[in-house]
Amino acid sequence: MGYRSEVAFAIAPPLVDKFLAVMAASEKVRDLIKYHEKYQEGIQFDKYEKGDVFVYLGSIKWYEEFEEVKKIKEFFDEHEEDDDNIRFVRIGEDLDDQELMGYYQEDTIYIPSPGIQF
C-alpha cells in the first residue's frame, strides 16, 4: 500500500513550454500526469487562464526517489524564484506533512485549515 499524498500544481503560461519539455523528455512523467476522466485527475489545460497547465493527483505515492516525481520536483525547484508563475501543493497522510511553493492561483489551490464545523 505505502504512504499516499495528494498533489496539485499549476503553471502559468510563461513557463508552460518549459514544463512541456520535461513531459516530452520523460514517458514516466507523461504516464503519471495523463488525464483520467473517471477520477477527474491528471493534467488539464486552460483551467485558470488560456495557456496554463493544472495537474491534480489524488492518493498517489509521491516518493522523491521515483524518476517521474524527481523530474517534476526538479522543474519546480529550478523555477522557485519565478514563484508568481508556479504553484505546487502536496499534503501527505499526516496533516503536518505539507509542501507549498509559489503563488500562481494561490487563492484557488491551497490546503484548507482544519476546523470544527457545527
What function would you assign to each model-found segment?
Residues 1-27:
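Short, extreme N-terminal segment that most often corresponds to the first beta-strand
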Residues 22-118:
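Charged interaction segments
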